[in-house]
Amino acid sequence: MAEYKNYTLNFGPVHPAAHGVLRLILELDGETVVRADPHVGLLHRGTEKLAEFKPYNQSIGYMDRLDYVSMMCNEHAYVMAIEKLLELEVPERAQYIRVMFAEMTRILNHLLWVAACGIDLGAMTVFLYAFRVREDLFDCYEAVSGARMHAAYFRPGGVARDLPTQMPQYKQTRFTSKRKTKKINANRQGSMLDFLDSFVVDFDKSLDEIDTLLTDNRLWKQRTVDIGVVTAERAVELGFTGPMLRGSGVAWDLRKSQPYEVYDKLDFDIPVGANGDCYDRYLVRMAEMRESNKLIKQCVDWLRANQGPVLSDNHKVAPPKRNAMKNNMEELIHHFKLFSEGYCTPEGEVYVGTEHPKGEFGVYIKSDGANKPYRLKMKAPGFTHISAMDELLSGHMLADTPAIISTIDVVFGDVDR
């Protein structure tokens, strides 16, 4: 009888460690991965083509649903591309608000990443710790937009509205005592800026808890050290960006190398790894959360000291004030025309790249002068990273596959688009 040495295994698309709908066809020699063939496209929704049939301002909601755990960072690149096309000035206060929410989104993304990675590798407790913190940031999303995830808060020319002067509070239920309700509402008595002042102090302590659980944990290091190694030279050749690139020791960050918004006015460092393995990518993301926390604090201090408009006064892209719209027919017509027909942009093409939590997220728009893009193309960091799956997995044990997939931090909303 013939002896079969290699065999093929389907990993996903419904495997809990596939992080979405990834289908991997693994060729195994015993328990060693010989070849990995990633199949993508199972979450394709035609976002780029949909946006080409909508006015520019009606596609912001689509951006939230690309990488659906880094919502406002997707919006950020899209509205900046429209602003570049229109040569539109954004008020400074709006820029600080955008940067603050972009860094909140980075923390949201990395907390979900460390929680999911922990579960993949058998560390359940970190999931509970991370989600406890994420709730506070989702409350900030809800306070400015009314939605806890798909906010559509960034607009061409600024943001939809200024920061609220009152944070939402928990209500007492039959499951919580009056004393406990008062305790959890203690930091919600003032404005959002007051709440964030309290958050940045508490968040450092929360990161210390996760550090204690994982960083020097012997089992965690056994599952991540020297697993999925990518050298700095190879990471550049493969087109890696974000933590995947910085984990290999390359200090490339668009917020520093090609500053946008007000990042050139803020003080922060770029964490880098040394060995390019799963453990280094974990350390980089943990350090990035601390840097994002510092950036949020700097934005809060500036916003507290400086008032001003949060949306451009260019009436071509900015809707009228709501109270004016309810009292004057001209403003009502303006509002209706703006949100039904949108606005035309000059002919031309632009590309804007931002430092997304997963890497460089880019938006390319080609305009023919109409009120909708002639062509919209998005550069998703996850697509580039997942293209290197064969190289990352080959030679490793089957049990290392979830660790490597997890540290890539892939979400198929933006990979498949």
Curated annotation (Swiss-Prot):
PROSITE patterns reported in the protein's UniProt record = COMPLEX1_49K (PS00535)
Which reaction does this enzyme catalyse, per its entry?
a quinone + NADH + 5 H(+)(in) = a quinol + NAD(+) + 4 H(+)(out)
Keywords attached to this entry:
Cell inner membrane, Cell membrane, Membrane, NAD, Quinone, Translocase, Transport, Ubiquinone
Q: Where, subcellularly, is it found?
A: Cell inner membrane
Q: How does it sit in the membrane?
A: Peripheral membrane protein
One term of GO molecular function:
quinone binding
Concerning InterPro entries, the annotation shows:
NADH_Q_OxRdtase_suD, NADH_UbQ_OxRdtase_49kDa_CS, NDH1_su_D/H, NiFe-Hase_large
Does the UniProt entry include the keyword Translocase? yes
Where, if anywhere, are coiled coils annotated? none
Q: Which GO terms describe its cellular component?
A: plasma membrane
Enzyme class name: translocase
Record EC number = 7.1.1.-
- Its chief place of residence is membrane
| Recorded family membership | Belongs to the complex I 49 kDa subunit family.
Q: How does it assemble?
A: NDH-1 is composed of 14 different subunits. Subunits NuoB, C, D, E, F, and G constitute the peripheral sector of the complex.
**Could you tell me what this protein does?**
NDH-1 shuttles electrons from NADH, via FMN and iron-sulfur (Fe-S) centers, to quinones in the respiratory chain. The immediate electron acceptor for the enzyme in this species is believed to be ubiquinone. Couples the redox reaction to proton translocation (for every two electrons transferred, four hydrogen ions are translocated across the cytoplasmic membrane), and thus conserves the redox energy in a proton gradient.
Protein name, per record:
NADH-quinone oxidoreductase subunit D
Q: Which organism is it from?
A: Francisella philomiragia subsp. philomiragia (strain ATCC 25017 / CCUG 19701 / FSC 153 / O#319-036)
Q: What would be the name of the gene that encodes this protein? A: nuoD
